[in-house]
Amino acid sequence: IIMMPASDSMLATANQMCSDAGVYFGTMFRTINDEEIKKEVYDSEYYAGGCNEEDEEAAYNIVKNMAGQGVGNLCVINIAKGDTSSDLRDKGVEKGVKETGINLLNTTYGIAAQTDMTKTIESYIAAYPELDGILLAGTYCDAALPTIEKALSDHGMAGKVKVGRIDFDFTMGEYLKNDTFHVAYGGQQQIDPLLSTVILVNRVIGTPIVEDKPFNLITNYLELTSSEEADEYLKYFLGKNAVFTPEEIKDTMIKYYDDSINEDTFKEIMKNFTVADVAARHEGMED
């Protein structure tokens, strides 16, 4: 079983259920922050490990990037408080604004509907005439970026307010080209589930990446700041082919076929993983 634990508390129950049933499990997208729960899960013979990204570091880096683009007064939109990812991104934003001197005007949490996203942007515009940056640090709202862009455009603010987001989407290129969207961090949607599954499969078939303990891998967020990069992301990450083909997975990630594969193998894979890397490996493949 692969799961995305939005909170640490659910893992204690999941761990017990999987242990009782003799079922291996892994995690994706999230780390475990509660030390007591983490020890309990890591001590389980059925926890294979997983893959998660550096949420705090990504939020910190994107705030620094926006500061470098001239943002001095920032509003932030994030997933609901209590979500592991949201809380870590909050920490990164806090660190970034403290270091750069950006004025954090407002943080809004848990927007799920486009109408609420529009109202939030309009309230920012009305309340903060000094506003010059909006960071979409996380959301489960559909079409969040187009909704933000339309609200800014309707009020004559598109391009005047720098917009950044964590988590790539397929609309970024258009807005980057128009210079109304400015930076995105993401790419984990494609690589985290894949590597979490690979880690679990290796454990289930009896060739774990590391012996006698879970294997957890940290992925780096990728940065996009141009429409050309966004176009390559659309083609090579969201196209017909996965970021690693079945042949690449078999040859480079499944220890059963190559017993030299180890922890360092995966660290090297992540070190080299970029949009340009995927484009180079898959250039000429059928879309």
Locations of regions flagged by a protein language model:
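Short beta-strand elements at the ligand-binding edges of bilobed clamshell
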Residues: 37-65, 178-190
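An alpha-beta-alpha
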Residues: 48-107, 200-234
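Hinge/cleft segment of the Venus flytrap/periplasmic-binding protein
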Residues: 100, 195-287
